[in-house]
Amino acid sequence: MAARDDAEARAAQREREVADLTTQVSFLQEELTALRRKLTESPRQARVLEERLHEVQANLAAVTGQNERLVATLKEARDQIVALKEEVDRLAQPPSGFGVFLESREDGTVEVFTGGRKLRVNVSPAVEVDSLKRGQEVMLNEALNVVEALGFEELGEIVMLKELLEDGRRALVISHADEERVVKLAESLVGQPIRAGDSLLLEPRSGYVYERIPKSEVEELVLEEVPDISYEEIGGLMRQIEQIRDAIELPYLHADLFREHKLRPPKGVLLYGPPGCGKTLIAKAVANSLAKQVAEKTGQSGKSFFLNIKGPELLNKYVGETERHIRLVFQRAREKASEGTPVIVFFDEMDSIFRTRGSGVSSDVENTIVPQLLSEIDGVEGLENVIVIGASNREDMIDPAILRPGRLDVKIKIERPDAEAAKDIFSKYLIEDLPLHPEDLAEHGGSRGGTISGMIQRVVERMYTESEENRFLEVTYANGDKEVLYFKDFNSGAMIQNIVDRSKKMAIKQFLESGQKGLRIQHLLAACVDEFSENEDLPNTTNPDDWARISGKKGERIVYIRTLVTGKQGTEAGRSIDTVANTGQYL
């Protein structure tokens, strides 16, 4: 009984276990089915998750970019706010003034000129008082204290210096209205080599002059130079050169002998004669020769000055201006001469500005210009090392008071060159190192010197032969006499130089065309013919007598001129000079 109960109990137990196992099997089967279904669906879910991941990453990148843009915008806005604040602060500041520094005081304050007032103000610690210079511009704050040092004024009025005062820090100047004013020299000008006649920059409110304008009024009219022309470069004028050396160099180099003999050196020299014959050339050579003589005498480097006055530019439409310019020229000469330097004041075309008083047609400006020059020349009497040289084609038009002894003492006529002088002039331009044609060299045995001499001899004979082809003019005098003039009567050093230049150009053209290099006698002869042909129409003034005087023909008055030229187009008929178009040239 008991055994049966026990068996039933175990059977019931097994049934329960079987039921549990069956339940578990069913659950596991369901789980297995669910897992199989999930396994089947997992690739699709993975794709969905990947898509969501990409979408989230894209959204994240967009949000990040937007965030960066917002940060940049905020930074830019902050910078703009700071800049605007600075601008507002700057605009809200009171204005700064400017003044001119005058001088410093022992207590650390300085005196400035501002707003038409002279003030004593304090200086910012950032500015060194010792570095401030008189006339310097300074910046002032609202309390009118110096806060910054600036430069010197660059704008103002132009005034002319009349003289420096004794203290060396003030000067007497002349304004544009001829008003005289005492001004102060800024620190930039103190100690600088300024002289009377210089143009200065003036700031009229403060009364300071700041700088020297490079081109002074006198320098516009005076060419200040040291010529490099020597007497050896001048041909055909040995007698005139000796005369001018005796007149100018001897008194300077042997002043003790002149004093011993109580001989007064000449004050000036007049060089007169036809155009192109070397008047200006001689005047330039004098300065160069003086410099060399000074160097030999003193053992130091010699230096001389040649003040070449541009005569017609001295004339000015305002009354008294021309006379003032002349005074400034001689004042400049005295300054140079006071340093022991020989100075030559050269007036070229002297007849254009110092004509005989009373000969003017309308203005009679010479009535005041000539006396000014006379007073300056007389003022040179007690001054050493200043020589006045005048040059003119029409010495008969210069005021006689200038030409009298005691002013322009020495008068030297520069004549037209004769045949011997022409050979000397040609030898200055035709030298042995020029390229010569082989055929011409062969004619003279290969001697370069002999070839040059032969060329010069041939061309001079061509120029100075009184042949039919060299006839130039027939002049009729007031008494009825007639005279035939040849080209040689109008020859000059300038014409000879032009002939040589023409021949050299012909030689160059021949080399370019044929390849044969070298100067030939044919080039010189052809150049001579061309020069004569071009000069055929030059004596074309409507006043033959004036033309003759300029050309160096003196004597009986000429009333009629007829040309006698055998040119490239044959012999031309004679013609009155009055019928030729007036081109304003002179032979």
UniProtKB/Swiss-Prot annotation:
For this protein, the record's Pfam families field holds: AAA (PF00004), Prot_ATP_ID_OB_C (PF16450), Prot_ATP_ID_OB_N (PF17758)
**Positions bound to ATP:** G276, C277, G278, K279, T280, L281
Alphabetical list of InterPro entries matching this protein: AAA+_ATPase, AAA_ATPase_domain, ATPase_AAA_core, ATPase_AAA_CS, NA-bd_OB-fold, P-loop_NTPase, Prot_ATP_ID_OB_2nd, Prot_ATP_ID_OB_N
Any one cellular component term from GO for this entry? proteasome complex
Q: In which pathway does it act?
A: Protein degradation; proteasomal Pup-dependent pathway
Chain coiled-coil ranges: 1-94
Q: Name one GO biological process term.
A: proteasomal protein catabolic process
The protein's job, in short, is: ATPase which is responsible for recognizing, binding, unfolding and translocation of pupylated proteins into the bacterial 20S proteasome core particle. May be essential for opening the gate of the 20S proteasome via an interaction with its C-terminus, thereby allowing substrate entry and access to the site of proteolysis. Thus, the C-termini of the proteasomal ATPase may function like a 'key in a lock' to induce gate opening and therefore regulate proteolysis.
Q: Which family does it belong to?
A: Belongs to the AAA ATPase family.
Name of the protein in question? Proteasome-associated ATPase
Which organism was this protein described from? Streptosporangium roseum (strain ATCC 12428 / DSM 43021 / JCM 3005 / KCTC 9067 / NCIMB 10171 / NRRL 2505 / NI 9100)
